[in-house]
Amino acid sequence: MWIQQLLGLSSMSIRWPGRSLGSHAWILIAMLQLAVDFPSCDSLGPGPEFRLLSRPQRPQRLWSLRSGPPTRLPTPAWSPRAARAERAHGPIQMQTPRARRAHRPRDQVATLGPKGGLTKPPAATRSSPSLASATASSSIVTAGAAEHQGLLRRGRRHTHDTEFNDFDFRGGRPTTETEFIAWGPTGDEDALESNTFPGGFGPTTVSILQTRKTTVATTTTTTAASTATAMTLQTKGVTESLDPWKRTPVGVSTTEPSTSPSSNGKDIQPPRILGETSGLAVHQIITITVSLIMVIAALITTLVLKNCCAPSGHTRRNSHQRKMNQQEESCQNLTDFTPARVPSSVDIFTAYNETLQCSHECVRASVPVYADETLHSTGEYKSTFNGNRTSSADRHLIPVAFVSEKWFEISC
């Protein structure tokens, strides 16, 4: 376009010679633009340094559920080599998009390959190399379709197996789950077997005798047949645990038994927990024992105190009786003035201190006797106070008379 404008300007300069300066300026501008555009045109031309920078390709998958294995490597959108090959061998068959394959049914996947491989352009039918390449591509497509069908079957089997992930197909024996509590053995008679069927059956706990009865009645219903076959497989072998090296023998319960009555009419007894006693608990036994010990200790203490207090009361009575006897003896000693019997000072003072009534009577009874004697023997008192010693009878009688007079004055 700009070349045509340049030619028009040159013709105008020829027609109008007065405007030659403006035409020369336009010619210079056009030459500069050509000089700038020529390197870009050289880079686009074919040559040894020509390289097409295509998009980075993703790593090819070995197989896929949707599209299957790839039959040929994808080519870039445009390249000179592809154009040359298209000129030499005719148009190249393009790959179908993945989105269109994904929405087609699986039954048509097998028919896509041969049909695509058999449809050849007329140019390809004329040339023998193109025919050989087409037959090879058709064989590759059919092989890919067969492999794709096998992968689809394997995928179906895999999805079918995921529904029974808790079931072991090696022997038809169910595996124990981790949520169940492993109870201890409950004996040979009450041994229980547990089965966990996947799906809608739910966990069931049946005894060995009941499993044998169900094996006999397999011809009644289909459900009874399925449960009986599974039960017979389990009763013949051993119940497999989660670990392959740990196996539970037949007759040992691995799950909590049900409390519903069995078909025999006998209630199934629950398993016994280790360490559990049938009677009282441990803390109750300890409480009862401590209370009995305290009661026995209280009884023993009461008996000991009674035995200790009985002799002490007897001794108190004896001491009181002894004091009364001493008082009577003291009263008799005050009225008896024989020289052979001389009361001691302890007996006299204890008698007067204990009971004043006895002392008053004793003193009043003895006053006339001592009064008469003191009237006749005044000199003897003086002699005794002067230091002259008297006889033994006077020496014993004077203190008694003196003490009795003084006590009589004090008390009366």
UniProtKB/Swiss-Prot annotation:
Residues 306-412 are cytoplasmic. It is a single-pass type I membrane protein. One of its GO terms (biological process) is cell adhesion. InterPro entries: AJAP1, AJAP1_PANP_C. Keywords: Cell adhesion, Cell junction, Cell membrane, Membrane, Signal, Transmembrane, Transmembrane helix. GO terms for cellular component: adherens junction; apical plasma membrane; basolateral plasma membrane; cell surface; cell-cell contact zone; cytoplasmic side of plasma membrane. Its main location: membrane. Residues 160-171 have a biased composition (Basic and acidic residues). Residues 44-284 are extracellular. It comes from the Eukaryota. GO terms for molecular function: beta-catenin binding; protein domain specific binding; protein-containing complex binding. It holds the Pfam family AJAP1_PANP_C. The chain crosses the membrane at residues 285-305. It is found in: Basolateral cell membrane; Apical cell membrane; Cell junction, Adherens junction. The keyword Transmembrane applies. This is Adherens junction-associated protein 1. The lineage of its organism: Eukaryota, Metazoa, Chordata, Craniata, Vertebrata.
